[in-house]
Amino acid sequence: MQDQKQAVKRVTGAFALIDSLRRHGVQHIFGYPGGSNLPIYDEIYRAEQAGEIKHYLVRHEQGAAHAADGYARSTGKVGVCLATSGPGATNLVTGLATAYLDSVPVLAITGQVPRSALGTDAFQEIDIFGITLPIVKHSYLVREPSELPRIVVEAFHLAMSGRPGPVLIDIPKDVGNAQIDYIPVEPGSVRRVGYRPTERGNPRQINQALQLISEATKPLLYVGGGAIMAGAHAEIAELSERFQIPVTSTLMGKGRFDENHPLSLGIVGMLGMHGTAYANFAVMELDFVIAVGVRFDDRVAGTGDQFAHSAKVIHIDIDPAEVGKNRSTDVPIVGDVRQVLGDMLQRTYHWERKLSRNKPRNGTDLNQLREPIPLTVPHPEDGISPQDGDWELSHQCPDAFYTTDVGQHQMWAGQFVQNGPRRWMTSGGLGTMGYGLPAAVGVKVAHPHDTVTCISGDGSFQMNMQELGTIAQYGIGVKVIILNNGWLGMVRQWQHMFYNDRYEATNLEDGTPEFARLADVYGLEAMNVRQRKIYQRRLPKALSHKGPMILDVRVTRDEDCYPMVAPGHDNSDMMGLSS
């Protein structure tokens, strides 16, 4: 008791908030000030003066949420964003939904009108607590200032444990100003009643899974974003090598396994609507699938049970709601992916001995598949193809962190860009145009000495191009590659394929700024590129430039992204394959 009494300090709620963030290792916050969150900003000022926390002023609150998202994905830590009440808070919504669908640990802190004004339709009052309930793991409205330290600890625990995701704390202005007796609450010391995610898989189900692995002749490890979030890269590699099981991934699972590894389904053996043909064909011939941290969503698995329709399926996921939701499962295992795979590996000796060494695995057949159905990179005589743009970028900068926006350029990047764990950031669930640039800001803040490249399109880039101001203000050295084809490219492709070339509201040739000139207005370096040879010469200079760099690459205008599985079709029914 004596120690506790000595630890008590009389402080404001805002001080307790910022000190609690600091105790969780928070060094960077992305945000935008307003009337309701000024008490918090006053404490951020003190923390910045002390060199404890750095705040980055974004140009739109959506950018703050995406920057916190990119920070979190690339580090495995909680990313923090901050907004004021009303429109500031609602501007976070798309960013929080993006993080929620991709299971990203983001802490959003919003200002709110004083408690006495709640429910009165006060200026800039909005029920952000209620608005965000479907798109966060948990929302808090802080009514008692003394509860702030506990709520922060609880929020970090919720964001990081189980299936990661965003958490929102809504703080009325008078709560931030209120004086409280502050006793710090140590990180990890608080657990939410009734919240106990299952981390260890059921031993009986793990044994059943190993039994099926030992009997399979055509197995496959199918890996998604859940494996990235769990940090299960080493366990996946060991399981694959120990049982000689080929590995493929979803768009969200890129980087989980060395794409040059003999057991990888190629560069890039990605499944789904725009996955590689050999990966999509191979999955239809399997007799066994180990699905790790995946959702079997429609862009990968089509109509669910059509996916690997002859195969038995083990589905491993931390979220019991995902197991068996879209594809029936023979052995469901609920638990932390890394823990479950680790437990499986500990038990494998017995099953390795049972594994018949003369049973062929499907690696040889897959090697044969790759040769007749490779990904192609067009080399137009006059210009540059978007595929060539992505391939050349990956070839010249293999160790970079990559963010993407959403559209054709995202799918081509998924096909051609190679990278390691936590070096690939894209909006795979919500499909948020405008994600890439602010996400790259967050990644670069977290990794100041690494190359961070945003791959965007001319449509997506205009969604959040105001964040060039943030980049300019803080000298954040991201490299932006805009694959500019003058279209909303993916929508145009669908209009071409399914709507008889009725191109309504997809032409961007008129009204789109010259991005290099726009960058110049912000005081940033930029280049225009229209020819492949010039691109090959200028790209190394752009990537090695110490500060920010924007490269406007005018690519061929009417290129379609193939292969493509039409909605509602199984993975073997692909469009755009040559006979």
From Swiss-Prot:
GO terms for biological process: isoleucine biosynthetic process; L-valine biosynthetic process. It is an enzyme of class 2 (transferase). Pfam families: TPP_enzyme_C, TPP_enzyme_M, TPP_enzyme_N. Pathway: Amino-acid biosynthesis; L-isoleucine biosynthesis; L-isoleucine from 2-oxobutanoate: step 1/4; Amino-acid biosynthesis; L-valine biosynthesis; L-valine from pyruvate: step 1/4. Mg(2+) binds at residues 458, 485. FAD binds at residues 163, 274-295, 317-336. Keywords: Amino-acid biosynthesis, Branched-chain amino acid biosynthesis, FAD, Flavoprotein, Magnesium, Metal-binding, Thiamine pyrophosphate, Transferase. It catalyses: 2 pyruvate + H(+) = (2S)-2-acetolactate + CO2. Gene3D superfamilies: 3.40.50.970, TPP-binding domain (3.40.50.1220). It comes from the Bacteria. This is Acetolactate synthase. SUPFAM superfamilies: DHS-like NAD/FAD-binding domain, Thiamin diphosphate-binding fold (THDP-binding). GO terms for cellular component: acetolactate synthase complex. It comes from Arthrospira platensis. GO terms for molecular function: acetolactate synthase activity; flavin adenine dinucleotide binding; magnesium ion binding; thiamine pyrophosphate binding.
